[in-house]
Structures are given as C-alpha cells and as structure tokens.
C-alpha cells in the first residue's frame, strides 16, 4: 500500500496472507472455513496464514491452512486474467476465532460513490523500486464514479468492478496487495484486482472486484451448489 501507515495490529483480524513460490497475495476470511481472494492469485501450490501482523515476529495465535477446495466463476473468460477476478477457497480445516483472527461478513448493501474505503496489505510501499514491509500498511481512499474509471482505462473495467483511489495520486494498493480487501464504511466491498502500471497514479484509480455482485455466487457455493454461475 502506497501512501499509508502501518496498520494497527488489532484492525485486521480478517486479513490473511497467501504465499507460494516467489509471490504472495492478501485474502479475507469470511467465516470459519472460507476465505476470498483474487482469481489471479491462484497457483498450484499455496498456503495461507491467518492471524499474521509482522512476518518476522509471530503472533501466538497464528494459524496456517491449505486450500481444500477452490472455486472460480465457471463463466470466467480464461484468456482474460482479470475477468471475474474472484476466488473462493475452502480451508482444509476450520479456523477458531482468537485475538488476531475473526471473519469479516459479506456486504449487505452495495457501496456508494464517494465512500471512504480502507485498503490494507503487505504489498510494496514504494515505487518504482519495490519495498515490502514486515507489517501490513493501511490507507484510506475514496470510491470513484464508474464512468470516471472507464474514461481513465479506455472503457476497460467490467461492470462488476469498483474503482477507488485519490485523484491527486499517491495512495493506492500496489504489487503484493492483490486479493486483499477494500472496506467501505465498515463493509467488505472489494477485492484488490489491478491498477495502473505504476501504482498511485491519481487519474487511474485502482480496480477492485465488486464483492456485492458476487455474494449470491459465494453463498451458493458455500451451501454446496457448485454449479452456480457468476454475473456476466
């Protein structure tokens, strides 16, 4: 996260850390057995750590999990990495809530333009050279009007995405923050998907998967209906 500060150790009990060979992502715990991240964070072999703050100084209640099942939208266009950029993961065993671990529920309402949204992650805090912090960084940005975003990206973002940033630039998610949450007015509204080639370019806000549009798909999969499709 660019332009932020170290997150408070107690403000992100739902934020988890996904790591594989040579890369990592954020993810969000939504209940005792399920987490949500970006589809582009998938790999054949990854582990997830919950209850993490510092990567060097471990919390006593940290828990590590492997994916038991992974779900991406069956109607996702596989040739487009960023189409329907959401993945639902069932953990290999349930998590118990603890001091640094607690889920964030799915949103009950869609987000509104202008909302103040919190971003967080262990991604780079500098550009163009990347610097990865030991603890997650947090910043507040704003939800931007969809049309503004389409203009900035030549019509690229799909309707099931949100745009958020600050127009003067300098505050943004960055490399390594993918898959983490966008929390607007206390609700889990977005998943970090992509952004301008260089993070923090004001006129090009970050692009986030719109969680509200996928709540039905998520709930159906959790209930065992794995044939559920996502919105177009």
From Swiss-Prot:
Expressed by the venom gland. GO terms for cellular component: extracellular region; secretory granule. N-glycosylated. Contains sialic acid residues. Deglycosylation reduces in 50% the formation of fibrin clot. InterPro entries: Peptidase_S1_PA (IPR009003), Peptidase_S1_PA_chymotrypsin (IPR043504), Peptidase_S1A (IPR001314), Trypsin_dom (IPR001254), TRYPSIN_HIS (IPR018114), TRYPSIN_SER (IPR033116). Disulfide bonds join 7-138, 25-41, 73-230, 117-184, 149-163, 174-199. One of its GO terms (biological process) is proteolysis. Its EC number is 3.4.21.-. The active site is at residues 40, 85, 178. One of its GO terms (molecular function) is serine-type endopeptidase activity. It is found in: Secreted. Inhibited by leupeptin, heparin, and 1.10-phenantroline. Residues 1-223 form the Peptidase S1 domain. Keywords: Blood coagulation cascade activating toxin, Disulfide bond, Fibrinolytic toxin, Glycoprotein, Hemostasis impairing toxin, Hydrolase, Protease, Secreted, Serine protease, Sialic acid, Toxin. Its main location: secreted. PROSITE patterns: TRYPSIN_DOM, TRYPSIN_HIS, TRYPSIN_SER. PANTHER family: KALLIKREIN-1, KALLIKREIN-RELATED. Belongs to the peptidase S1 family. Snake venom subfamily. This is Thrombin-like enzyme BjussuSP-1. The lineage of its organism: Eukaryota, Metazoa, Chordata, Craniata, Vertebrata.
